[in-house]
Amino acid sequence: FDPGLINEAIATAPSEFTLHARNPQHSVTMNGDNIVFNMMASAPNCSDTDRGRRAGNQEDYRNFLRLAQMHNILHVTGGYPVEPVDIHPSVRHLDCIQDYITLTDKAYCIYALGEDRVSDAIEMTRIAHGLTRDPMRDQACMFSIINTNSPLQLDIPMTQGLMALAEMGQLVVITPFTLAGAMAPVTRAGAITLQNAEALAGVALSQMVRPGAPVMYGGFTSNVD
């Protein structure tokens, strides 16, 4: 991208916005002074003292959501706390979002794995919030982590998801998947430079789709050791 194009696009990104929960008491304001905690996401396994380590499943997924709802230190639920691999991937997002809606009243994270799944998530969330499509464009109710396919690439499903969410005014967190020594330079400076370039490209794309759409700069840079 041309530097001038990037600067012009990111200038429309909002410095503050609200992520709306179905329970207004759990809505959170995103800005430079607020810290928002959520669960980790996408663990393949879980464990406890009774049954030990096991593959992710819907029962445990639901129990983690109940914990997220109960704990006041978690402001939003985040993504799938454990991946429910007992649900077929083609319909997993439908079951997981239904569980979000029925077991929590906090904002949640959906997975931007293509336009169709994002459209399902938008429609289910819209209904749960009692909104029509136009008001929803001005009320961020969910978010998604958009990982780049480093180096310097956004794959098609993530790009489709990013654009669909931005068009509907829903929050996207652009998070480059940069591992130093693998898909990023091995030096700290090089890896962070790549992260910044990829993140700014994603932020700019969201604003090209809909100026003023809520967007955040995420970072994942680590190493392969």
For each predicted feature, which ranges?
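Helix-rich catalytic cores of soluble enzyme domains
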Residues: T49-D225
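Glycine-rich, N-terminal phosphate-binding loop and its surrounding beta-alpha-beta segment
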Residues: F1-S47
